[in-house]
């Protein structure tokens, strides 16, 4: 988790992006084969077409280097807020650890 947290700090030191760990790793229920679920929330107005490559893909790459599966999902703040009544949103909110 240290490498993931360090990458988040490096990538987003001057930006308006938040990265959260959720799922089994956040709950402390992970097994060796568990993936790392990351929610990336960017400010509204971010060029979402290029945002995945800029904000999410580096986590996928570091996962390959570490031999881990990292699964990032990306939303803008308003997109994430629109998910408020979904089971996914509620599960993430229950588990989320800000990196």
Indicate residue ranges for each PLM-predicted region:
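Conserved H-loop
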Residues: 24
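Short, aliphatic-rich beta-strand segments
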Residues: 37-41
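Catalytic core of pol beta-like nucleotidyltransferases
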Residues: 1-18, 27-32, 42-99
């Amino acid at each position: 988790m240290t490498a993931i947290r360090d990458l988040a700090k490096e990538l987003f030191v001057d930006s308006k992006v938040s990265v959260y760990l959720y799922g089994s790793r956040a709950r402390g229920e992970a097994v060796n084969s568990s993936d790392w679920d990351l929610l990336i929330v960017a400010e509204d107005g971010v060029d979402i077409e290029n945002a995945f490559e800029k904000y999410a893909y580096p986590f996928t790459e570091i996962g390959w280097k570490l031999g881990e599966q990292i699964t990032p999902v990306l939303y803008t703040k308003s997109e994430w807020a629109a998910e408020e009544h979904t089971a996914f949103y509620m599960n993430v909110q229950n588990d989320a650890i800000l990196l």
